[in-house]
Amino acid sequence: MEEKQFRDKVYWLTFLFSLLVVWVHSFNGELFMGTPEAALEVARIEHILGESLGQIAVPGFFMVSSYLFYRGFSWEKLIPKWRSRVRSLVLPYLLWNFLYYMGYVTATRLPGLAGVVGKSPVPFTGAGLFEALVCYAYNPVFWYLFQLILLVALAPLIYAVMRGNATGAAALGIMAWGLWMNRAMPVLNLDALFYFCTAAWVSLHRDTWGRKIEEKAGAGGNMAAAAFLLLAMVLLRYLGRPEGLLWARPLFTVCWRLWGVCAAVLAVKAAKLPAAREWMKHNFFLYAIHFAWVRLINKAAAVLFP
């Protein structure tokens, strides 16, 4: 497909993921339901919608970010791409974490807002500022950006491994084994590394076997891809059944969310969508502000309508 069409599809996809992130963080049944039985039923419905569908959003962001980073990548492009990510990731990460910290410092000292925020006065100290800026202490949804920054910093190592077919497949196999065994890594999440490396592997081979991602496909090609995804879903459900190979394994959750991302990519690619509007291109802003507003609206509504 043409470059403009590809970019429009990316904007549509990331906009969809942004809406799903808001959806996941909009759970509010426990704030309004008076009886435990009613609250439990509402929570069950919210869990089905949010956990089954909404949880593909962050893996999707990891994979889109990785695919774009390694699209047409070479060693000569490493420094320019790092410089670009400092502007688009690191600086906004620090700025928004600072704003959230100052917002909590201020709001917890205002009588009208302190009750809504539900925190004791947040101290303004050097240690607190460091925790807020670096460790996203007052902006929990930015764990994703923290992980993404780490992954971008590891770009040379990831590129060296994933640019080879055999080494890339072996690396993904090792990560899959680690997820199956429920292994953990210090600081970096293994599932985030798996999503990022999977997309990097495809992107680095977009001129060969990975070209199908960007190629136009007719009705027959889309139907074949949908049939493949359907078979993959059946296989995953079978392996994830009680006593199955993936039962109660983190690898099942990771594969299920990876399947969801693939389904979303196919849906956006196959759909005849109009050009992305300008406001749809500012997904970082929506991601940055949504959590505070969603929680503020929910808590304020719970106070006003007990």
Each PLM stretch: what is its role?
Residues 1-175, 277-278, 282, 304-306:
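Membrane-cytosol interface segments of multi-pass membrane proteins
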Residues 3, 36-43, 139, 157, ...:
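Short, structured coil/loop segments at alpha-helix boundaries
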Residues 194-198, 204-285, 291-306:
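Alpha-helical transmembrane segments and terminal signal-anchor/GPI-anchor hydrophobic tails
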